[in-house]
């Protein structure tokens, strides 16, 4: 059964007699989550899970069951469920969801596990992960947002889904309004040259953004 007690079909077990190594046919649980081996000889048997369903975690434990003449034996085993990880992306100022953001999910050994893109609700889900520590980082953000969100580490546990939240600010805009100093009427076709300067580098990096002209009134 699953960790929440619901029957779990589709799980395959291997039964072997320990005394002489006799192996019986592998059998798979049905819709009610059960398997029955009949007509067995008394003795001690090894029971081991061979495979499980995709959204659960394989149990590698080898269980021993002793059978006695005239007595049936029952063993109840559980599989933990794989956790899901949902990533949420929102506007840092308005809280509105931000679709179209690409996130990279990496495992503990830094190998890439998944690459997902947020949908219209600003979220993306990576399903059926193994328990462990994962790094979630932004790979790209849609315009007009800045890629300023730091990577986050998240620990996943069996039977527990997790959510992780990211926020981004929009790129700032500059509006220049040119007007007559006396009448305050707007002045058309005035040209301005704009340069961007960084305050995050020792050299004060500068970038020429170009020349812009005021629109018609």
Language-model segment annotations:
Residues 1-217:
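Solvent-exposed loop/turn and edge beta-strand elements of beta-rich ligand-binding domains
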């Amino acid at each position: 059964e699953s960790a929440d007690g619901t029957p779990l079909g589709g799980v395959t077990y291997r039964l072997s007699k320990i005394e002489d190594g006799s192996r019986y046919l592998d059998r798979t649980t049905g819709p009610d989550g059960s398997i029955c081996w009949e007509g067995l000889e008394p003795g001690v048997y090894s029971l081991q899970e061979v495979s499980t369903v995709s959204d659960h975690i394989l149990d590698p434990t080898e269980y021993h069951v002793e059978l006695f003449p005239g007595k049936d034996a029952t063993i109840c085993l559980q599989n933990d469920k794989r956790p899901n990880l949902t990533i949420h992306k929102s506007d840092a100022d308005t809280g509105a969801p931000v679709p179209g953001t690409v996130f990279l999910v990496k495992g503990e050994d830094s190998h890439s596990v998944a690459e997902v893109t947020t949908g219209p609700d600003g979220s993306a889900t990576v399903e059926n992960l193994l328990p462990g520590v994962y790094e979630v980082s932004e790979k790209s953000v849609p315009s007009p947002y800045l890629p300023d969100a730091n990577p986050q580490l998240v620990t996943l546990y069996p039977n527990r889904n997790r959510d992780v939240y990211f926020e981004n600010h929009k790129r700032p805009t500059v509006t220049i309004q040119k007007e007559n100093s006396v009448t305050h009427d707007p002045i058309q076709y005035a040209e301005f040259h704009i340069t961007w300067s960084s305050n995050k580098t020792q050299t004060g990096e500068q970038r020429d953004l170009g020349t812009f002209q005021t629109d018609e009134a």
